[in-house]
Amino acid sequence: MYQPDFPTVPFRLGLYPVVDSVEWIERLLESGVRTIQLRIKDKRDEEVEADVIAAIALGRRYNARLFINDYWRLAIKHRAYGVHLGQEDLETTDLKAIQAAGLRLGVSTHDDMEIDVALAAKPSYIALGHVFPTQTKQMPSAPQGLAQLASHIERLADYPTVAIGGISLERAPAVLATGVGSIAVVSAITQAADWREATAELLAIAGVGDE
């Protein structure tokens, strides 16, 4: 039963790019994307605050679901749509503050044990990864593959889910066929020969999500 302690999100968030700059946020929102995450790693809050402010403003302008990865204090301060946290961030984050601010929460998972941890937090959605090998970030866990992803989806039933990790344009239909609500992509867009074409094709497959 989907009863999060945080505001709900649609079961289908649609195409969900994860990018590291305001420039990419603006490009992709202009191209029709309506769910997106700003993920800037390993900087102090004061170093990223201007980017967080700009990204949130763009999200509002385009009526988009803009998630801030990790910088939850800034997300609360500037009223982002939501926050996304990794497993390692859950213990050091004031989840009640995020909840009280009315922000949505997404949590990363890599196996059944981490899904248990995520479910205990009752987030708005659960991210499942990494599905395929990925060069975007160093991963201590092994790729889960489609069969394991489908097993997680069956377990989570009506919980909004996002698949992430090595999802290319070619692999996207098979990933969505597992029943996962959304697909997060990184290099499939940012490293594409033609990012506009890649974005349009991925939007045609994954959509923009439910209202």
Swiss-Prot record:
Residues given in the record as Mg(2+) binding sites: 70, 89
EC number, UniProt record: 2.5.1.3
Binding site for 2-[(2R,5Z)-2-carboxy-4-methylthiazol-5(2H)-ylidene]ethyl phosphate: 134-136, 166, 186-187
Name listed for the protein in its UniProt record: Thiamine-phosphate synthase
Cofactor (UniProt): Mg(2+)
Pfam families tied to this protein: TMP-TENI
Protein function: Condenses 4-methyl-5-(beta-hydroxyethyl)thiazole monophosphate (THZ-P) and 2-methyl-4-amino-5-hydroxymethyl pyrimidine pyrophosphate (HMP-PP) to form thiamine monophosphate (TMP).
Binding site for 4-amino-2-methyl-5-(diphosphooxymethyl)pyrimidine: 37-41, 69, 108, 137
Cofactor note: Binds 1 Mg(2+) ion per subunit.
Alphabetized InterPro entries for the sequence: Aldolase_TIM (IPR013785), ThiamineP_synth_sf (IPR036206), ThiamineP_synth_TenI (IPR022998), TMP_synthase (IPR034291)
Lineage, highest ranks first: Bacteria, Pseudomonadati, Pseudomonadota, Gammaproteobacteria, Enterobacterales
Pathway involvement of the protein, from the record: Cofactor biosynthesis; thiamine diphosphate biosynthesis; thiamine phosphate from 4-amino-2-methyl-5-diphosphomethylpyrimidine and 4-methyl-5-(2-phosphoethyl)-thiazole: step 1/1
Catalytic activity entry: 2-[(2R,5Z)-2-carboxy-4-methylthiazol-5(2H)-ylidene]ethyl phosphate + 4-amino-2-methyl-5-(diphosphooxymethyl)pyrimidine + 2 H(+) = thiamine phosphate + CO2 + diphosphate; 2-(2-carboxy-4-methylthiazol-5-yl)ethyl phosphate + 4-amino-2-methyl-5-(diphosphooxymethyl)pyrimidine + 2 H(+) = thiamine phosphate + CO2 + diphosphate; 4-methyl-5-(2-phosphooxyethyl)-thiazole + 4-amino-2-methyl-5-(diphosphooxymethyl)pyrimidine + H(+) = thiamine phosphate + diphosphate
One annotated Gene Ontology cellular component of this protein: cytoplasm
Coiled-coil segments: none
Family, as annotated: Belongs to the thiamine-phosphate synthase family.
